[in-house]
Amino acid sequence: MKKRIALVTGGFSGEAVISYKSAITIDKNLDREKFDVYKIDINPNGWFYELADGAKTEIDKNDFSLLVNGKKINFDAVFIGMHGTPGEDGKLQGYFDTLKIPYTSCDAATSALTFNKRFTVAVAAFSGISVANSVVLIKNAFQSPDEVAGKLKFPVFVKPNNGGSSIGMSKVNKMSDEFGSAIEKAFREGSSPK
């Protein structure tokens, strides 16, 4: 009997665009002789499975199941193909742990830690791992790019603290207006609606 796999994609951040692309690749490479794959889109509007006719059916979050043609579908495992929150920050992992549904990726605690760059750097440094010099900026306490420029050697990479590694990331080669724009971009992308 084939295993039922939920391929989770989407997300609540700008990284959803990347998640959808990843899901296409994952979907193409899962062995259909072994697995029945259901692509589940999690986005700010809800959690859905799209039927062949284009109609969407909502996921029952009480047990992460869905109804297809009156038949309840429960999943044997989840393939997390989501970038950003809630797929990389431990939220989905914790949810699936609660439901005792196995999933790909690391556990909830590891996901939560590694999604936060500041915490990850602190734990790595405490463990004796060499880390690059970095400065964490707090949005409401941040005054200007000049206050941090002297603490860093250019070029620098500016990234959201609680985001992925692609959306909101900028490489800045020298102190300029570009540095301030990169910081603002990171602040925008680092905030998630849910």
Model-identified regions with their sequence ranges:
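Active-site nucleotide/adenylate-binding loops and adjacent lid/helix of ATP-dependent enzymes
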Residues: 5-9, 13, 21, 113-194
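ATP-binding N-terminal substructure of ATP-dependent carboxylate-amine bond-forming enzymes
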Residues: 1-109, 113-115, 119, 138-146
